[in-house]
Curated annotation (Swiss-Prot):
The keyword Transferase does not apply. The lineage of its organism: Eukaryota, Metazoa, Chordata, Craniata, Vertebrata. This is Myelin-associated neurite-outgrowth inhibitor. InterPro entries: FAM168A/MANI (IPR029247). It is found in: Cytoplasm, Perinuclear region; Cell membrane; Cell projection, Axon. The gene is fam168b. It is a multi-pass membrane protein. Keywords: Cell membrane, Cell projection, Cytoplasm, Membrane, Transmembrane, Transmembrane helix. It comes from Danio rerio (Zebrafish). Inhibitor of neuronal axonal outgrowth.
C-alpha cells in the first residue's frame, strides 16, 4: 500500500514538504464538515419551480416553469392536444396513388417506424402493392362437366361418350422459315470509331 495515501480523512491540511505556493483562497485542506443535505436543488423557495403537488391538484403540470398554473384535468391519456399529430381514423382512407375509387381497395399508406427497418433510419412506406393495383379478376370457374360428358353422369357411365367424341382438327404444319442469313463473307467492314 502507498504509505503516503491515507484513505481516512484526517481533517488536517495537506503536508506541503516542497513549499509549493497555492493561489489565495485555494482549499489546502478538508472542510471542517460537509454542508448539510438539502432535498431542494436550489437553496430557498423558488416561485418559478413549484415544490410539489398540493393535494387535489390535477396530475398534469405546465410546460413552462414561469407560472404555477396547472392546465385543467383531461380524462384522455394523450398529453398532447388533438391538433398536434394525426389520429388514426377508424375508416380506411383512399390511397393517394390510386386515383379511381370503387374497384380499388382502400387501405392507408402505412409507414413503418424507423426501428423496424434495420440498419437505416429512413422511413419507407410499405403499404403499396395491395392498394395500388385493382383486385385481380378470377378466371371463370369450371362447371364440373367434362368436355364430351353428359351432365349428371359419372366417368364410367360416359366412357363411351368420351371415347367417341370428335377430337379437334390437327393444326396445319408450320411454314418452314429459311435461315436468317446464309453463312458467307459479310458485305461490310468494321470501321473503328474516329475519336
Amino acid at each position: 500500500m502507498n504509505p503516503v495515501y491515507s484513505p481516512a480523512s484526517s481533517g488536517v491540511p495537506y503536508a506541503n514538504p516542497k513549499g509549493i505556493g497555492y493561489p489565495a483562497g485555494f482549499p489546502v485542506g478538508y472542510a471542517a464538515a460537509a454542508p448539510a443535505y438539502s432535498p431542494s436543488m436550489y437553496p430557498g423557495a423558488n416561485p418559478a419551480f413549484p415544490s410539489g403537488y398540493a393535494p387535489g391538484t390535477p396530475f398534469k403540470m405546465s410546460c413552462s416553469p414561469t407560472t404555477g398554473a396547472v392546465p385543467p384535468y383531461s380524462s384522455s391519456p394523450n398529453p398532447y392536444p388533438a391538433a398536434v399529430y394525426p389520429v388514426r381514423s377508424p375508416y380506411p382512407q383512399q390511397n393517394p396513388y390510386a386515383q379511381q375509387q370503387g374497384t380499388y381497395y382502400t387501405q392507408p399508406l402505412y409507414a413503418a417506424p424507423p426501428h423496424v427497418i434495420h440498419h437505416t433510419t429512413v422511413v419507407q412506406p410499405n403499404g403499396m402493392p395491395a392498394a395500388m393495383y385493382a383486385p385481380p379478376i378470377p378466371p371463370p370457374r369450371p362447371n364440373g362437366v367434362t368436355m364430351g360428358m353428359v351432365g349428371g353422369t359419372t366417368m364410367a357411365m360416359s366412357a363411351g361418350t368420351l371415347l367417341t367424341t370428335h377430337s379437334p382438327t390437327p393444326v396445319a404444319p408450320h411454314p418452314s422459315m429459311p435461315t436468317y442469313r446464309q453463312p458467307a463473307t459479310p458485305t461490310y467492314s468494321y470501321v473503328p470509331p474516329q475519336w
